[in-house]
Amino acid sequence: MKLDITTLDGGSAGSVELNEAIYGLEPRADILQRMVRYQLAKRRAGTHAVKNRSDVDRTSKKLYKQKGTGNARHGAASAPQFRGGGRAFGPVVRDHSHDLPKKVRALALKHALSAKAKASTLIVVDDIKVDNHKTKAMIERFEKLGLSSALIIGGSEVDENFGRAARAIPKIDVLPVQGINVYDILRRDTLVLTRAAVDALEERFK
């Protein structure tokens, strides 16, 4: 698969041959969905908790004697049915993450890349180095490229000026190639890869 390489200013910088085994697969929604669920579950803090009947500050004394009052039988005031009582079966602190095989995770990334390539929303740029960190100038560059919602993947390190200029622009995310992931690819309309990112992904999936 051949794709034209563009510059940040919208010019041409040649072309690149993309590996069909990475960018030419038929996207499978089930694999992408499994990966997104895996990522979102893993990032959950899981710090939710409530007080059960052993945690609330109520006396454990029996409210009144068992028989002879005509009232229903009750024990401690900390029971869930009473105002101020403990919560029954409430959330507890726990880890929400679940396992997903490494091969499935790698395959999901290939399918996400292939989905962008198939939809013609994959752009390759030669480099993302800029001379200053002016956001206004960066917005003008993105308008030339037709980018309003994009994930931009740099090389092993993102140019500092580029990162500072782009971080204030809504719906524009910038990551080094090590940080590329399925969720961030799918949540933006366009995927922008640098030539260095293309080479790094090729090496990664060898």
UniProtKB/Swiss-Prot annotation:
Name of this protein: Large ribosomal subunit protein uL4
GO process terms (BP): translation
GO CC list: ribonucleoprotein complex; ribosome
Phylogenetic placement of the source organism: Bacteria, Pseudomonadati, Pseudomonadota, Alphaproteobacteria, Hyphomicrobiales
Annotated GO MF terms: rRNA binding; structural constituent of ribosome
Naturally occurring in which organism (per UniProt): Methylorubrum extorquens (strain PA1) (Methylobacterium extorquens)
Coiled coil: none
Function of the protein: One of the primary rRNA binding proteins, this protein initially binds near the 5'-end of the 23S rRNA. It is important during the early stages of 50S assembly. It makes multiple contacts with different domains of the 23S rRNA in the assembled 50S subunit and ribosome. Forms part of the polypeptide exit tunnel.
Subunit structure and binding partners: Part of the 50S ribosomal subunit.
Entry keywords, A to Z: Ribonucleoprotein, Ribosomal protein, RNA-binding, rRNA-binding
SUPFAM superfamilies: Ribosomal protein L4 (SSF52166)
Name of the gene this protein is made from: rplD
UniProt record similarity statement: Belongs to the universal ribosomal protein uL4 family.
